[in-house]
Design a protein with these regions (language model features):
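Short, flexible helix-loop junctions that flank or precede catalytic/ligand sites
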Residues: 2-5, 10-14, 18, 28-415
Length: 415
């Protein structure tokens, strides 16, 4: 059980209260956050450690509650710590409440000087956080984002999986697994897509782990931040964190070409420069994996093309058609037992798909996926039906999570 919050926080509350009392009453809003950032280092080392230990205890609670995310601070939290447990955001009512200033100090105490300056200048900070989970005697990593909520400081921390799921457990068609294998295809682009929290990183890590166990390659991972840290096995794996080891995704991709890679993993194709660099690097005989915040294969193709300047779109469309290998789009759907299961759409690029991309007929691709089961493809609706027939998800969830509501109802009613 998690320790009683009334006994674990008495010292921390005193530390927080005494610090907050030093904040001049004449300053308001973001200036209060700046004051906290400028003066947090004046805390005694023991006080800093006590506040960090409180965060670690809250993270332990998060792990043991099977939560994926924790939220600390910000006006919207109303003093509570919130967690996302099996997909649902919930107040944790038996943890202590904090004022906005107290929460800001708890958050800022996690940062070094460079991170504080980045937060204050950019109004946002992506970072990773690691602590030692005593019960399992392992280091646990979190992806974190600090941001402002109506001039108050807030933070989300997302648990990075303690272990990597075997690629076989994700139930891809053997031909889909073959498409991501460096041993089978030496160069080209594979996209893993989905909304935030859909498990993209889990799938990407499973693919990396598969290479690390069975498919030797030199893999360079460029991410912001680095999440799961892979230990080299049959593959040599390097991790480059944006803002820490390299200045940008584009720089990381360009520099990787001088580092003798076989596979380059780009954490996210979030801007035109990164998209162009990722497409061009496949010209040099490398395999690229990356992610997008899109819900379907066709939406992913349209998004990439729309991200670049209109004068470049025709060239990018042709380049994408030439280098794209596969697109995996996924969602996490509530299960009947209160957990979540991955539903997926898989596009394998065939000559017909390639022609549709080049001719700007991406609307035709859905039916190609629908009819491409023998080639390893599956639509989101087909996979949702399969999960429903396996009695893993409800009918309501199958319809709710479908990209094409009309199509899901048609295939669910078919004999």
């Amino acid at each position: 059980m998690f320790e009683n919050p009334d006994t674990i926080t008495i010292d921390e509350k005193i530390i927080l209260r005494e610090f907050v009392e030093t904040i001049p009453t004449s300053i308001f809003g973001p200036d209060r956050v700046r004051y906290i950032a400028d003066n947090a280092d004046k805390l005694a080392e023991g006080d800093k450690l006590a506040l960090r230990n409180f965060v670690n205890k809250a993270l332990t609670r998060m792990i043991e509650s099977e939560a994926s995310d924790i939220e600390i601070g910000g006006r919207g939290n109303e003093g509570y710590i919130w967690m996302r447990i099996h997909g649902n955001k919930e107040r944790v009512r038996d943890l202590p409440q904090f004022t906005e200033d107290e929460s800001a100090l708890i958050i800022i105490n996690l940062f070094n000087d460079n991170q504080k300056q980045h937060l204050l200048s950019k109004r946002n900070l992506d970072f990773s956080y690691t602590y030692f989970y005593e019960k399992r005697k392992i280091n646990v990593r979190f992806r974190a984002d600090a941001y402002f909520d109506l001039d108050t400081l807030a933070m989300n921390m997302r648990l990075i999986n303690l272990s990597v799921r075997p690629l076989s457990s994700l139930e891809f068609h053997p031909l889909a697994v073959r498409s991501v294998s460096h041993n089978y295809i030496k160069f080209g682009l594979t996209l893993i897509t989905g909304i935030t929290g859909s498990g993209k990183s889990t799938t990407l890590d499973s693919i990396i782990d598969h290479h690390n166990k069975f498919d030797p390659a030199h893999i360079i991972i460029i991410a912001a931040p680095i999440e799961y840290v892979h230990t080299s096995n049959v593959s040599l794996i390097k991790h480059r964190e944006v803002g820490r080891d390299v200045l940008s995704f584009k720089d990381g991709i360009v520099q990787a070409l001088r580092q003798d890679p076989d596979i380059i993993v780009v954490g996210e194709m979030r801007d035109p420069d990164t998209i162009m660099a990722a497409l061009e690097v496949t010209d040099t005989g490398h395999k690229v994996f990356s992610t997008l915040h899109t819900s379907s294969a066709t939406e992913s193709l349209d998004r990439i093309i729309a991200e670049v300047h209109p004068s470049e779109q025709e060239r990018v469309r042709n380049r994408l058609a030439d280098v794209l290998i596969s697109v995996i789009s996924q969602k996490l759907v509530p299960t009947l037992d209160g957990k979540r299961v991955m539903a997926k759409e898989v596009l394998i690029v065939t000559p017909s798909v390639r022609a549709a991309i080049k001719n700007n007929n991406t609307s035709e691709i859905y039916m190609m996926i629908n009819q491409g089961g023998a080639q390893g493809m599956i639509t989101m609706e087909q996979d949702l039906k399969k999960l429903y027939m396996q009695k893993k998800i409800s009918l309501e969830s199958a319809i709710t999570y479908a990209n094409n509501k009309t199509r899901i109802q048609q295939i669910l009613s078919a004999k």
